[in-house]
Each structure stands twice: as structure tokens, then as C-alpha cells.
A protein has these predicted regions:
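Helical "substrate-binding/catalytic lid" subdomain
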Residues: 8-126, 130-131
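General beta-strand structural signal in soluble alpha/beta enzymes
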Residues: 1-4, 99
Length: 133
């Protein structure tokens, strides 16, 4: 799909990775909150299915988070690279993306702690780590 002049395809790929990374973070937080409150995250995903919060990420990565299965499909280290590219691109347009920056920092922490080869849904583990403080 043509989205604009030359270079727009690259920016679109970066935009896709913003949505993926931020949504993985949102799903991780939702599952963590449910678990902490004693709610069943499997039932949460079922309840959200078909509504505004439903997405492939909720269904696929949510299940991985619940199952604690972080076998890499999309690596954390690759998503960190993408987030760095996103922020570099944004900076070149004098554009601030604070949510993307937060997601990047969380992926960086995972990579720095030796989890670069896990699936990017392992962002859930960083949310869990933060909540064990």
C-alpha cells in the first residue's frame, strides 16, 4: 500500500513497531493487574475478545504471557533495535514519543539482563520485575 513519498514505507514499518511494542506493553500490564487482583487472565482475554481491546497481540502474546512461554518468534533484541530506530527517526523530525521511549527503556533493561533472545512478549517479565520491588 502506497502511504506517501519515498521513505514513507520505512516510516510505516517503524509506526507498525510502535503499535506492536506499545500494545505488548499494554497487554502485559493488563495481565499483571488481573493476576495481582486475583482475576483469571485467561478469562480476561476471553472477555475482551471481540471488543475494542481485542487484537492479534492480545490473543497471541497474551497467551504467551499467561503460559510464560517466551520462545522467540520476534526477539526482544530485535524489537529494541526497532525502538531505537523509531526514536532516531522521530528525533530527526523533532518529534517526541514518550511512550515509545518508555517501551524502549523496558526492552533495553531486558536485553541488558540477558533476555535479548526471548520473545518480545517477555516485556511481561519486566512488568513483573518492576512490581516485585
Amino acid at each position: 500500500t502506497l502511504v506517501g513519498p519515498i521513505g514513507s514505507g520505512q516510516v510505516s514499518k517503524l509506526a507498525n513497531q510502535i503499535v506492536v511494542g506499545v500494545t505488548i506493553g499494554a497487554v502485559a500490564e493488563a495481565i499483571t493487574l488481573c493476576e495481582k487482583a486475583g482475576a483469571d487472565p485467561v478469562k480476561l482475554i476471553k472477555a475482551l475478545s471481540g471488543g475494542w481491546a481485542d487484537s492479534k497481540i492480545l490473543q497471541t502474546h497474551g497467551k504467551r504471557m499467561i503460559d510464560k512461554d517466551f520462545t522467540p518468534k520476534g526477539k526482544t533484541s530485535t524489537h529494541l533495535k526497532d525502538m531505537n530506530n523509531i526514536l532516531e527517526c522521530a528525533n530527526s523530525y523533532n518529534t517526541h514519543l514518550p511512550i515509545s521511549n518508555l517501551v524502549k527503556e523496558m526492552y533495553k533493561t531486558l536485553v541488558d539482563n540477558g533476555h535479548g533472545n526471548t520473545d518480545h512478549s517477555s516485556l511481561y517479565n519486566e512488568i513483573e520485575r518492576i512490581n516485585k520491588k
